[in-house]
Amino acid sequence: MGKLLKIVSGLVLLIVGAAIVAPRVIDPNDYREQIQTVVKEKTGRDLAINGDLSLSLFPWIGIGLNDVSLSNAVGFKAAPFAKIQEANVKVKLLPLLSQHVEVSTVILKGMSLNLEKNQAGKTNWDDLMHPSTEPNATQDKPIEQSSTLAMGAIAIGGLQIVDANITWDDASKGEHYTLAGLDLTTDALSLGSPMGVELALTVDSRKPKATVGLKLNGDLVINSTFDQFDFQGMTLVLDAAGNAVPEGAMTIEMTSHLIADLSDGGSLTLNPLTIKFDDSTLSGNAAINHFAKPSIQFDLAVDAINLDRYRPKPTDTESSAQTTSVAPPPLAVALIPVQTLRDLNIEGIFKAQSLILKGLTGEEVSVKLVTKNGVLKSEQGVKKFYNGSYVGETVVDARQNTPKIIVTEQVTNINIEPLLIDLLGESPITGVANITAALTTRGNTVPAFKSALNGTAE
């Protein structure tokens, strides 16, 4: 036994000694041309290694790259397909002997990736994805079963991505998006334990013209099978600007506890959930189950919201056209998406302390929505509505090919004058209104609604 230990100790010392001496003797930069030649043969692309290559073997097996780029595919832009200013990754040597993998913090700086699709629908990475047609002697050999490391035996010191940029240019659709300044930093990855995550990036779009800045942080827990993600203390901030953004600019701040489960059909929960935007604060919870055929639940409340701020505003051309002639909508157009309604499974409650819509103000607003098996039911109420109140219920039954609609509404003690002033800017009449309506109809077009309309209103 003693002799065996001496032999093993000698081998270990020999390996360690070689690992220490090798990087001093071997310069990876001497193999720069060979590496570039192999890449050219395998991909047809030019690999440019303009910076130094570094190599270490003990106590970490590591490699470092500086200023490396890969040329674009033939027929696309002259800019490189990919470029990296600096990359470093290291694996600890001695733990490998006991089948444990310890990876240092993975560092990636200044990465640029240009993704393109031409008018024919071909992308600039198609040539990299297609397998080689050359015969491979190893393809006919049976694949041997190899032992795999359990994820618990792998430890990663963290991830650091600095100033990454990705461009997407689709000539077939006229789309152009840029993801710029991506910074991602994580703590050490330990499955089952919280890992701090910080992410920041900016997305630019040409059509529609918009810019969105994103900042995300929190503690992420990942299970050993990588199908459950628990994001604790998650904070997301979005700064959006552009023609499609209400008022031209908007900031959204969201805090939540997010749990995503990709097993058993998948689920996503946000509980609790708080969203701040403009002068409003939305709070509550939301969940989605079974991604293939979603079941959605929510319970949300907002303190105050002006929905007119988020309604699309007519352009100058549209406003001019409306003053000259108003074209009625096509009468035969289907108004209810029957199949979509049949597929929906939604149950939720929305409340607002104060809500403005089309200039009208309501307080203590509530909407209860249930959609299941092709039947949509909405119960809505406004407890304070121009010195009165409003309650209503709407049912859309799309189980048959011809939808059926039932509407019941009751308005009590509404002061007409201030309501019409808010709605129209003036009020030719005054007084108090009490209205009760119970209406039914069938069909899916305006003429069908009018033809089948039945009920009372008083």
Annotate each language-model stretch with its function.
Residues 84:
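Phosphate/ribose-recognition catalytic cores of enzymes acting on nucleotide-derived substrates
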Residues 87:
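An amphipathic, basic-hydrophobic helix/alpha-beta surface used to engage anionic
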Residues 91-97:
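A glycine-/polar-enriched beta->alpha junction
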Residues 17, 60-81, 103-130, 158-165, ...:
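Small-residue helix/turn framework positions
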Residues 1-44:
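N-terminal type II signal-anchor transmembrane helix
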Residues 128-148, 313-339:
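Intrinsically disordered, low-complexity segments enriched in small/polar residues
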Residues 41-67:
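Short extracytoplasmic
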